[in-house]
Amino acid sequence: MIEVQDPFVGRTLDEKYRVEERLAAGGMGAVYRARHLLMDRPVALKFLHQRLVEDEAARVRFLTEARAAVKLRHPNAVSVTDFGQTSEGCIYIVMELLEGRTLREILSREAPLETARAISIMLQTSGAVAAAHEAGIIHRDLKPSNILITQSADHPAVVKVLDFGIATFSADDDEDVIVPTQTNTVIGTPRYMSPEQHNGAELTPATDVYSLGVILYEMLTGTVPFSGATPAEIAQKHANNAPFSPREIVAAIPPEVERIVLHALEKQPSHRPANAGKFRNELLDTAERLGLEHHAIKSAPDIEVLRDAGVESPSGRLVVDISRLREKRALSSGSNEIKILGAPPAQESKPNNEPSSSSSFIDKLKRILGKPQKSTKHN
């Protein structure tokens, strides 16, 4: 058997990225581990198929999305740091390299999750999506395989949401399906798509809220609200069927949490929370009322604040003394949400308006996308 040599492994791109190995591949491209030679640190390179560059509409949409993505700064969103093109014309994006498990992998082994754990993951996830909505980005393809859970000694259970800004063109796993409609071509994952997305209608941030509701439903119950043998069957159910009550599946789910899930799964976008920030606020308020900070909610950044206000159990889980935590909250300035549940607050996640870094990134992007058939080295 003849082994086919990967065209990128071993190459150095733009005189600073040495490609080391391919990590994953899908219908729309591939992701590689690489090393930034000037900074001596690992990065991830995501290559997009050439056909997306050669299509005029795709170039325009990609430029618009990338302009927003480079301005997005949030601790729960994967960072996009650079952009380039190979001598063959293949476009790639440079991202932070993350190690961990996707939520899909976790659910396949551990679902349903405890309510506190599910809420902790969703607060971090919705915080990143809320920041995207503030920056004018609608993700369009939120699903468990686009949510990575990283873990380390310093920051256990930190969520990273993947594929901001390029989700429309993403197909990195076997969940992705392109669903043609009469009016449009919809790219997404049928089990997590809203009714309006299935129908090819205009999308709003409420579309992402619906997907977040599906993900939270699955974390809590171990199953998605609707499934079927074909995308058309799934679309019909999303449009017309009422989901089973989560508490009918898992009785231990608090009624208040169930109401939030079902609110996000309303058929009409206007009946849902308008954006991820509003959805997250509902979830956070409910978590506080239920006292869920007493339950093993593992933190994202600012874990030390929680540790100062609580103790770790023999199993390594953190139990927080609410009275001490509120004292610390009163003494602190800035956000208090991150100090309660370890989920970065949406209102702190402003778009990055620094003209120097984002402008140079977009200028480079325009130069590359303006000449899809030919490639020259960029500065």
What are these regions (language model features)?
Residues I340, K350-N379:
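Long, low-complexity, intrinsically disordered segments
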Residues A252-L265:
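Conserved C-terminal C-lobe helix
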Residues M1-F244, D363, L369, K377-H378:
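Conserved ATP-binding/catalytic core of the eukaryotic-like protein kinase fold
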Residues Q5, A274-G342, S349, S357:
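Juxtacatalytic C-terminal regulatory tail of Ser/Thr protein kinases
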Residues D172-E175, P225, S270, E288-A296:
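Charged, solvent-exposed alpha-helical segments that act as regulatory interaction surfaces
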Residues R101, M219, N241, K267, ...:
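Phosphate/oxyanion-binding loops and surfaces in catalytic or ligand/nucleic-acid-binding neighborhoods
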Residues E266-N275:
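A conserved short helix/loop substructure at the end of the activation segment
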